[in-house]
Amino acid sequence: MSAVGRLAAVSLAQVRGALCGALLGDCMGAEFEGSDAVELPDVLEFVRLLEKEKKAGTLFYTDDTAMTRAVIQSLIAKPDFDEVDMAKRFAEEYKKEPTRGYGAGVVQVFKKLLSPKYSDVFQPAREQFDGKGSYGNGGAMRVASIALAYPNIQDVIKFARRSAQLTHASPLGYNGAILQALAVHFALQGELKRDTFLEQLIGEMERIEGGEMSASDAGEHDRPNEVKLPFCSRLKKIKEFLASSNVPKADIVDELGHGIAALESVPTAIYSFLHCMESDPDIPDLYNNLQRTIIYSISLGGDTDTIATMAGAIAGAYYGMDQVTPSWKRSCEAIVETEESAVKLYELYCKQLKTP
């Protein structure tokens, strides 16, 4: 099937699934954020009680969803992508609700963006950390909507990079966002095989990382022996894990990470999605693949809201809205607005598909 044929097959259900999956991951993951040791039975008990809850909107979203909403609003208002508009929306969203869990570093970026002193919207991010920029996962956590708005893979890469660079100037930060956007993009294309999916991601990231030499940052900020094509290295490790059976979660965390760095979380989200395409012996089969993905990603501990929101976006894009169950959907704040946004993003996607 041609690329155009595959793109034309993307459905509203997939776009809704991606945004709702991301929201579910954020809201549910936030309940466990910051704990290095999350026990799976605790996550399953949390889910069981949640499904019995009669009151709607009992789980609240974090900065992950707040920033995702800002991205969506900007894309809808400025379909050709406008970094000035997006930066303004980031800063204003923070100013409106500063208690959603923002990190101290990005708060300084937002405050500078609110100042008339800065005419270059990328400058505040470049000034972070003595000019090295942030390598955190904040650009990746909000980037799924880029893949949901633009069918062309080069647009996905370009706009994922630019949207992330508004707050994350380190190649490790914005390349993590590109990888997450690509994962959503490829998940939208229909039935996939895990190895093929990973090979597609590795192929794109080899070109991107090789061209930008982001590995120089990996030596400073991460493991000294992982200095060449860091995201590709993690993707290859995922292939190794998937080829094995019953890999301990401790090994997943040790090798892929569960932290706030993009390198320590985006590959973990991708692994969670791919691992949960098949049954997990520790997670009851009554849960579907999307639910299993979110449960599993939370059980890895660490930055649970962000890893789960990224994994949820990928899984939702692949499985669609059918796997977003009513009891889970009802539990989340802003679910109605999220579904409304999905319709508008899908309309934008279809318009972009028709653009020569």
Swiss-Prot record:
**Keyword set for this entry?**
Chromosome, Cytoplasm, DNA damage, DNA repair, Hydrolase, Magnesium, Metal-binding, Mitochondrion, Nucleus
> Which residues bind substrate per the record?
D63, K132, G133, S134, Y135, G136, N137, G138, H168, I260
Activation/inhibition comment: The protein undergoes a dramatic conformational switch from closed to open states upon substrate-binding, which enables specific substrate recognition for the 1''-O-linkage. The glutamate flap (Glu-33) blocks substrate entrance to Mg(2+) in the unliganded closed state. In presence of substrate, Glu-33 is ejected from the active site: this closed-to-open transition significantly widens the substrate-binding channel and precisely positions the scissile 1''-O-linkage for cleavage while securing tightly 2'- and 3'-hydroxyls of ADP-ribose. Activity is inhibited by calcium.
Q: Where in the cell is it found?
A: Nucleus; Cytoplasm; Chromosome; Mitochondrion matrix
Pfam families referenced in this protein's UniProt entry, alphabetically: ADP_ribosyl_GH
A GO cellular component annotation here is: chromosome
Positions of Mg(2+) 2 binding: E33, D303, D305, T306
What InterPro entries does its record include? Answer: ADP-ribosylglycohydrolase (IPR050792), Ribosyl_crysJ1 (IPR005502), Ribosyl_crysJ1_sf (IPR036705)
What is the superkingdom listed in this entry's lineage? Eukaryota
Where is Mg(2+) 1 bound in this sequence? D26, T62, D63, D64, D305
Swiss-Prot/TrEMBL GO biological process terms: DNA repair; negative regulation of necroptotic process; peptidyl-serine ADP-deribosylation
Task: Assign the protein's first listed, main location to one coarse class.
Answer: nucleus
Tell me the SUPFAM superfamilies matching this sequence.
ADP-ribosylglycohydrolase
Q: How is the cofactor bound?
A: Binds 2 magnesium ions per subunit.
Q: Which cofactor does it need?
A: Mg(2+); Mn(2+)
Q: What is its EC number?
A: 3.5.1.-, 3.2.1.143, 3.2.2.-
The positions annotated as site (Glutamate flap) read: E33
Q: Which GO terms describe its molecular function?
A: ADP-ribosylserine hydrolase activity; magnesium ion binding; poly(ADP-ribose) glycohydrolase activity
Which reaction does this chain catalyze? [(1''->2')-ADP-alpha-D-ribose](n) + H2O = [(1''->2')-ADP-alpha-D-ribose](n-1) + ADP-D-ribose; 1''-O-acetyl-ADP-alpha-D-ribose + H2O = ADP-D-ribose + acetate + H(+); O-(ADP-D-ribosyl)-L-seryl-[protein] + H2O = ADP-D-ribose + L-seryl-[protein]; alpha-NAD(+) + H2O = ADP-D-ribose + nicotinamide + H(+)
> How the protein assembles, per its UniProt entry?
Monomer.
Function noted in UniProt: ADP-ribosylhydrolase that preferentially hydrolyzes the scissile alpha-O-linkage attached to the anomeric C1'' position of ADP-ribose and acts on different substrates, such as proteins ADP-ribosylated on serine and threonine, free poly(ADP-ribose) and O-acetyl-ADP-D-ribose. Specifically acts as a serine mono-ADP-ribosylhydrolase by mediating the removal of mono-ADP-ribose attached to serine residues on proteins, thereby playing a key role in DNA damage response. Serine ADP-ribosylation of proteins constitutes the primary form of ADP-ribosylation of proteins in response to DNA damage.
Family to which the UniProt record says this protein belongs? Belongs to the ADP-ribosylglycohydrolase family.
- Name this protein carries in UniProt: ADP-ribosylhydrolase ARH3
This protein's encoding gene: adprs
